[in-house]
């Protein structure tokens, strides 16, 4: 890789007050009775609510009434149509940026009455994905580089390279084969820049010995310099954000088609199923980590897997997602020679297998029992039966850690598994509403909490 030294980022600015967003006067809404509330823990229940769709935005999938699941008192509206909307970040002057890797651009949404004004802030990029601000400096992660742009009043200046030569499908050794080329970026309180570099495949052991190493989170020092591995064994850490105390967190897409690791019967025939790929086991293993990253941390992939079983290896075991230990991957590390799984720190928090967590951000002072916490856009499974549904998940911030998952926004998947939307990222706005991108529906939703 080649690298240039950026200037020291300013401290992260708090966005100023934004003009009140007025609801559109005419909308379509579901008229059927809402389903019974669903418990999400911590005293929060979900109720059915119509998705409010302004006139002019009511094209598929919003050409018919849609109902979402939210905590009681919240309302949700379709705020903007943005094709293939992915990650998002608020500018210091109260506008929302949305990345679109497929289109190679970053869209700028300027709030006003009704639908926000939409313009293109950046174009001609190579799969832009991660977005982050440090003061008035915008960081954009493309598939092969991270650049810093001076931002002012809806415009950016010339880019300053932070890290280039990052591995992507154009890398000579990959010859176009890169399953997780999209990068995410976050900026620490000290100005260090963190970049996620995904694995090339589901189980690609060569990533750990590649140069530069893949399945990592890299760190560029404050003031610039050579990126170095901050954390490894991070299969696809699309979710990347800095917590309220300055800690770095990642929400990780973990591996698929895991083999049963225990020398015991699991399918009821009496013989050992060790090394067998069993659908019933694959459906719930391994968990998707939501982990605090520290210098040198290893999340195990592809040699060790975090295990949600309260009773390891027992069919039908209760599933637990907090503080989970690792077990050997019997396909890649059967004898433990590749990596000592017992030596790895337990994963702080997690989600159900194949949830596909994408965007990660932190919110402050959400109403009721929610308070501060992490927001995770969960895309939903692609290879599980029944499918794990898409949602926006909330993890309460408690004493420097994250509590158990709660659903903040659901209802995107029908009983038969059909979906009309798939959230990618949720970010709290300067107006305290929560804004949610959806790349399947080509939408940005606005979630308004109840009045305090």
Model-derived regions: residue spans:
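C-terminal motif of bacterial Sec signal peptides marking the signal peptidase cleavage site
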Residues: 21-24
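Bacterial signal peptide processing site
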Residues: 26-28
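Beta-propeller domain segments
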Residues: 33-69, 182, 200-202, 215, ...
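Beta-rich, blade/repeat-based domains predominating
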Residues: 82-93, 123-141, 171-192, 232-247, ...
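Residue position within the beta-strands of beta-propeller blades
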Residues: 97-99, 140, 193-197, 249-252, ...
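Short loop/turn segments immediately following the C-termini of beta-strands
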Residues: 100-102, 143-145, 151, 198-200, ...
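Asp-box/WD-like beta-propeller blade repeats and closely related beta-sheet repeat scaffolds
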Residues: 127, 144-187, 199-202
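Blade-level signature of beta-propeller repeat domains, shared across WD40, Kelch, NHL, RCC1
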Residues: 427-452
